[in-house]
Amino acid sequence: MKILKGLIVFICVLNQSCTGQPSQKINGVSFVASNDAIDVSHIHPVINVHANYAAIMPFGFIRNLEHPELSFNSERQWFGERKEGVRQYVETFREANIQLMIKPQIWVWHGEFTGHIKMQTEADWKTLETSYAKFILEYAALAQELQVELFCIGTELESFVENRPDYWNDLILEVRKIYKGKLTYAANWNEFEHTPFWDKLDFIGIDAYFPVSHSKTPTVEECLVGWEKHKPSIQNLSREYNKSVLFTEFGYRSVDYSGKVPWESDRQKGLVNLEAQNNTTKALFEMFWEEEWFVGGFVWKWFVNHNHVGGENNTMFTPQNKPVEQIIKQYYKK
């Protein structure tokens, strides 16, 4: 019996603590689906930035915020958004020894915010629940088959969660029957404090688009001060549930005022400001990456064709081919 106990402790030390905290930070990228299969050459830039995790994101589509049925695994979708693409992406990342999270997401036509999905009748709620469960359980089964380390049961679905808490508790139980890895949910930055089922998951997942500065070009110090109004509530929730926090998404656009409304993704808004992106990103790393209760995160977002995306004239989130890529590389290397 002593030998067995010693072996269990040894395995826990090698892989992660027995409470579920990995021994190494999750230094992840949110890998955007494309319309083609990938190969190891597409993963070399991920390796070069010292990432050890990638989030693979299949999509389900919904007509509008009150429509109850999801469409997914359709031939009209891009390859990487479908089940066959997810499988191929996971298998290719595995060849490069990158660990994975499968993170199914919903896209509402015209880009409306998923947090506002809300049905108007009980019948429509039931239809949505059935449709969403089919979506999630199919990818949970794939995650189990492929031995994926992390699975995310939903992303920024505040109204759905708020209105149907019993459904979500039941869904987690159903996922647990299929998938034996670690579970999280990606709560929006202003949603996580009242997400009701953290006790049933392994990590508290937050899409970390917290406002931290009103300046055109915020300094690192200013952003650190801005984080002080948010960090205590994040840490307190971690203590309350005895769960590590995972930033299921984090990142900033390379625009003026990048720390003011970091969730905004309108291509028409903002002038290029690489320094603003650098400083907001540095502050996030300095504020969280050394905390024991913080497990890591996935930078938003990383595209397949590295040499043809991002760059110093790009105002969007991707860090690729911008100075901030080197900052991420520096912190991910630690």
Language-model segments: residues:
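Sec-dependent N-terminal signal peptides
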Residues: 4-14
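Boundary/entry segment of secreted carbohydrate-active catalytic domains
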Residues: 19-48
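The substrate-binding groove and active-site-proximal loops of carbohydrate-active enzymes
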Residues: 28-33, 69-83, 121-131, 154-162, ...
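Substrate-binding cleft and catalytic face of glycoside hydrolase catalytic domains
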Residues: 52-68, 83-161, 257, 300-305
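Aromatic-lined carbohydrate-recognition surfaces of secreted/lumenal glycan-active proteins
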Residues: 102-106, 152-161, 169-193, 242-250, ...
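Aromatic- and acid-rich polysaccharide-binding/catalytic face
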Residues: 136-155, 187-225, 244, 248, ...
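Active-site clefts of carbohydrate-active enzymes
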Residues: 159, 208-220, 237-278, 300-315
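Aromatic-rich peripheral "rim/lid" segments of glycoside hydrolase catalytic domains that contact
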Residues: 262, 266, 278-281, 287, ...
